Amino acid sequence: CNSYRVVDLGVMVSCDRILEAAERERADLIGLSGLITPSLDEMTFVAREMERRHLRTPLLIGGATTSRVHTAVKIAPGYSGVTVYVPDASRAVGVASNLLSDSLKTDYVAEIAADYEKVRVQHASKKGPSLISLEAARASAFAADWKHYAPTRPSLIGRREFRNADLAER
């Protein structure tokens, strides 16, 4: 694929199988793709396991459930190697080229690290919803006046049949 050899391990592959294959194949990069929400936690686990095993292979994160914020806040902090969010499969070749280039890698990795740090700071500074006390909520509760409410009468009560309606026309 674009002069890169890709080893596709399939779907729902365990962390051990991924890392064993990466070591056996002497992978230059490890790519994870998450299509369902539980994949997010598994990606974080893989990054922490790579750290525990002292691996330094760049980790590429992609897939429908992933995001730059999740990668920067949850995945990258668990791995001291390079972790890069790849928003679209079409960008994987460019990311791989940057990470495998002796002349581009250092600046590219520094740029990613600076961006992720900024994302983490912004994420940490976000305030949660401001909450009010139960007493204040009860004091400002909606007071319905059902005695003086007159519901609007629907224009049709019952059922309406549409005969000779061709559903293929729509």
Give the location of each predicted region:
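Short helix-loop-beta junction
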Residues: 1-7
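Active-site loops and adjacent core secondary-structure elements that bind or stabilize anionic groups
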Residues: 90-170
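Cofactor-cradling patches in redox/metallo enzymes
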Residues: 8-77
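Generic alpha-helical structural element
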Residues: 35, 85, 168-169
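A structural micro-motif
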Residues: 4, 57, 81-82
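Metal-dependent DNA phosphodiester-chemistry modules and their immediately adjacent helices/loops
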Residues: 65, 70-105
